[in-house]
């Protein structure tokens, strides 16, 4: 009987995923892509996108989840800017890049012994991991961050940057009607519950941390016209490209900027 109940639960969850994906496609086709604050464009709110300097000092970076999405874009940009990169992922064979300054290794965000030998001496650690939507409790973000902080030690000068998103902490309820009422509660509730826990763990730590909450991610090219906001009051998220998120991440670690800050990024 328990097997049948589990099968029914899984079938119902897959049906919800299909329904939300269909609605999401319609929504994406109608979306203007720009965020708002109190109904106005974000153009005059928050900070402009930072400017990357020419010929930055070489950094030694560790990136979790560097084989896809924002993580891969960040690896690409970091290498292009002359940095050393260690990409840690569960499936390193998915890496599409080869570079003299790239160390592509197998590791698990929640198992510090799988990456402990690579973490010493790193200038910054960036977490760009993601997991599939699930109705089961998710703990990878919070448990993984606990282990990362333990691995670097309380007196480390290493900057720790993590990507969460709209739905974590006080950003919940700022994604627009469809996202807030359908996508988040139906598909992403467990995901963002754990991202919220991860944010709390970082804030209570003694590390040099930065929490980055990007808006709705796209595969567009980088235009660096996004805004950097601190206050979510009256804000509704827009889009931002993964390339633009990587641009911000590199600015943060190169300039030592936004230390102990939680920021929201959106066009």
Give the residues covered by each predicted segment:
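N-terminal Rossmann NAD(P)H-binding glycine-rich loop of SDR-like oxidoreductase domains
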Residues: 61-81
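Substrate-positioning beta->alpha
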Residues: 194, 212, 240-250, 261
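N-terminal Rossmann-fold cofactor-binding loop
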Residues: 88-93, 109
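Conserved Rossmann-fold cofactor-binding substructure of NAD(P)-dependent oxidoreductases
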Residues: 103-122
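Glycine/proline-rich active-site loop of Rossmann-fold NAD(P)-dependent oxidoreductases
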Residues: 205, 221-226, 252-261
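C-terminal motif of bacterial Sec signal peptides marking the signal peptidase cleavage site
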Residues: 28-29
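NAD(P)-cofactor binding segment of oxidoreductase domains
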Residues: 132-161, 197
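Conserved beta-loop-beta element that borders a ligand/cofactor-binding pocket
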Residues: 199-221
């Amino acid at each position: 009987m328990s097997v049948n109940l589990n099968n029914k639960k899984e079938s119902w969850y897959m049906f919800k995923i299909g329904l939300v994906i269909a609605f999401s496609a319609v929504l994406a086709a109608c979306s203007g892509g720009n965020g708002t604050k109190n109904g106005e464009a974000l153009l005059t709110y928050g900070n402009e996108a930072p400017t990357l300097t020419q010929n930055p000092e070489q950094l030694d970076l560790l990136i979790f989840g560097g084989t896809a999405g924002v993580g891969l874009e960040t690896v690409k940009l970091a290498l292009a800017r002359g940095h050393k990169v260690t990409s840690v992922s569960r499936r390193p064979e998915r890496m599409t890049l080869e570079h003299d300054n790239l160390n592509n290794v197998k590791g698990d965000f929640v198992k510090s012994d799988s990456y402990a030998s690579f973490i010493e001496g790193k200038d910054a650690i960036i977490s760009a991991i993601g997991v599939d939507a699930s109705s089961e409790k998710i703990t990878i973000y919070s448990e993984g961050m606990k282990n990362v902080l333990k691995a670097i030690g309380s007196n480390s000068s290493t900057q720790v940057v993590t990507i969460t998103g709209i739905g974590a902490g006080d950003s919940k309820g700022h994604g627009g009607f469809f996202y807030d009422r359908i996508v988040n509660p139906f598909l992403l509730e467990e995901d963002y519950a754990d991202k919220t826990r991860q944010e709390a763990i970082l804030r209570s730590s003694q590390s040099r941390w930065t929490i980055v909450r990007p808006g709705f991610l796209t595969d567009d090219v980088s235009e660096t016209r996004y805004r950097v906001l601190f206050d979510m009051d009256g804000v509704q998220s827009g889009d931002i490209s993964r390339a633009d998120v990587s641009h911000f991440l590199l600015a943060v670690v190169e300039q030592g900027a936004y230390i102990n800050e939680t920021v929201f990024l959106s066009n």
